[in-house]
Amino acid sequence: MSKPFFELRIYKVFPDKVDEWLEFMEKTIVPFQRLKGMDIVGNFYSESFDLISNDGVKTDVNRNNDDRTYIWIRKFESKEQMKDLYKKVYESPEWLDTMNDKVGELIDRKSILVYQMESLPYSLIQ
């Protein structure tokens, strides 16, 4: 059996779709996934980011300050549980009939980043 781990998901929200995306996540996707058993431990939104060079100097990479990034974290007890929950959520009629297409209208699916991470012993999130 595998160890518990976290999944960090990063999405780029389309311009002029931020409010709609945030409401869709809050009122539809998050409650639906929690009902299916997903342990969602954090949801975040950012409109900018900074890159810091090796000498500690901030570089001006995102000059337009229009990054529109949505980040969320889910926890799984094992790889087996993750596979089971993915199936329950993403193969369900509710997802396929009412949510899947809507997601593609609001975020850039080609830019999705997903990290599977193990919590370190000194982390507050376990």
What does each model-identified segment do?
Residues M1-F24, T28-F32, P121-Q126:
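Surface-exposed interaction/gating patches
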Residues M1-K3, Y11-F14, T28-V30, D66, ...:
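Homeobox/homeodomain signature
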Residues M1-S2, D39-N65, E94-Q126:
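Glycine-rich beta-strand-turn "strand-cap" elements at beta-sheet edges
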Residues F6-K12, D50-Y90, Y115:
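Short, well-ordered beta-strand segments in beta-rich or mixed alpha/beta enzyme
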Residues E7, E20-E26, E47, E77-E80, ...:
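Glutamate identity and glutamate-enriched acidic tracts
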Residues K17-Y45, Y90, E94, T98-M99:
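Short amphipathic alpha-helical segments
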Residues R34-K36, E77-E80, Y122:
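A short, structured loop/turn motif at beta-sheet edges
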